[in-house]
């Protein structure tokens, strides 16, 4: 299973962890993914999805 949001397509972001002395080490900022059941009106059933918390937030705002 890939570490990608099935709704928005979000993936991990490459960045740097910067110390006090400004030494930079590479860091992977992962997406906060959650397993969630979402109602699909087209299929008339619950669908299990792996979606980001940002997508969950927008889904609850639209309902």
Swiss-Prot record:
Keywords: Chloroplast, Plastid, Ribonucleoprotein, Ribosomal protein. One of its GO terms (cellular component) is ribosome. GO terms for biological process: translation. HAMAP family: Ribosomal_bL28. It comes from the Eukaryota. NCBIfam families: L28. SUPFAM superfamilies: L28p-like (SSF143800). Belongs to the bacterial ribosomal protein bL28 family. One of its GO terms (molecular function) is structural constituent of ribosome. Coiled coil: none annotated. The gene is rpl28. This is Large ribosomal subunit protein bL28c. It is found in: Plastid, Chloroplast.
């Amino acid at each position: 299973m890939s570490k990608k949001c099935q709704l928005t397509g979000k993936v991990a972001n490459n960045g740097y962890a910067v110390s006090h002395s400004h030494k930079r080490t590479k860091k992977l900022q992962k997406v906060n993914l959650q397993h969630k059941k979402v109602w699909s009106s087209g299929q008339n059933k619950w669908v299990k999805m792996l979606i980001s918390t940002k997508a969950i937030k927008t889904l609850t705002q639209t309902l």
